[in-house]
Regions:
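Short glycine/acidic-enriched loop and turn motifs that connect beta-strands
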Residues: 3-6, 64-65
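Short, solvent-exposed loop/turn segments at conserved positions within beta-propeller repeat blades
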Residues: 7-13, 76-77
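Beta-propeller blade termini and top-face loops
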Residues: 15-19
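Beta-rich accessory regions
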Residues: 23-207
Length: 207
C-alpha cells in the first residue's frame, strides 16, 4: 500500500477493515483500511478463538529488511507476544494476553511522581520488563522514556502531547544494518493515550 501521512510506512503492511458481512450475498461492506501495527517487525498475523471467547493474535516479529541471526543463536526472528484483540468504537484494541501476568515478579510501583528533566526510578532496570506508566497533567509538551539503556544503546519512546503523536525510536538499539528505526503514529487526543503499556525483552529489543 502507498504510505499516507503516518500510515502504511513499513513496506509489509498488515491492515484490517471494520464493516458488515452479508453471508447470503457473500459480500463484505468495509470501511477504510486501518493499520494493524505500526512497527516494522510485524508480519503475517494470525488469530485464534479461545474457548472463553477471547480472540488472540500473534505475528512474526521480523522485518524482511533486517534479516540476521543474533550471536550464539540458531534461529532467526521470533513471534510477537500474543495479544487479546477486541473492537471499540470501530477500532481494534490490542492488549498482551492476561496469562503473561502469571510470570510477573518483583513488582515496583511509583505513584504521583512529578517528573521534570531527566529522572531515573530506583528498582526499575534490566532487560526483561513489563512496564505501565500513566501520564497525567497538561503542563508538558513532550514526554520521553529511554528503555533498555546501557553501553550506549537504548530505545526511546516519545509522546508529543502538543501534536498528539507517539514515536518509537530504535536508532541506537544496536542494529547491524542501517534500517528504518523511527515509527510514528497519531492519536486523537492526550486523553486517549494516557495509559501506556509496553514490554521490553532482550531478544525483542535486538530485533
Amino acid at each position: 500500500m502507498k504510505a499516507e501521512g503516518y500510515e502504511f510506512h513499513n513496506g509489509n503492511n498488515s491492515i484490517y477493515f471494520v464493516g458488515e458481512f452479508d453471508k447470503g450475498e457473500k459480500k463484505f461492506d468495509g470501511g477504510e483500511p486501518l493499520s494493524l501495527d505500526y512497527g516494522t517487525d510485524f508480519y503475517a498475523p494470525q488469530t485464534t478463538l479461545l474457548p472463553d471467547g477471547r480472540r488472540i493474535m500473534i505475528a512474526w516479529m521480523q522485518s524482511w529488511h533486517n534479516l540476521w541471526i543474533p550471536g550464539g543463536q540458531k534461529w532467526q526472528g521470533m513471534m510477537t507476544i500474543p495479544r487479546e484483540i477486541s473492537l471499540k468504537n470501530g477500532r481494534l484494541i490490542q492488549k498482551p494476553v492476561r496469562e503473561i501476568e502469571k510470570y510477573h515478579a518483583n513488582m515496583v510501583r511509583y505513584s504521583d511522581e512529578v517528573v521534570s528533566g531527566r529522572r531515573s526510578l530506583e528498582g526499575i532496570s534490566g532487560r526483561s520488563l513489563d512496564v505501565t506508566f500513566v501520564i497525567t497533567g497538561n503542563k508538558y509538551s513532550r514526554f520521553t522514556v529511554n528503555l533498555a539503556k546501557g553501553s550506549g544503546y537504548y530505545t526511546r519512546f516519545i509522546y508529543d502531547r502538543e501534536n498528539n503523536i507517539i514515536e518509537m525510536d530504535r536508532t541506537f538499539a544496536g542494529f547491524e544494518k542501517d534500517v528504518v528505526c523511527i515509527r510514528r503514529a497519531c492519536v486523537k487526543s492526550a486523553e486517549c493515550y494516557g495509559d501506556v503499556k509496553g514490554k521490553v525483552d532482550e531478544q525483542q529489543e535486538a530485533q
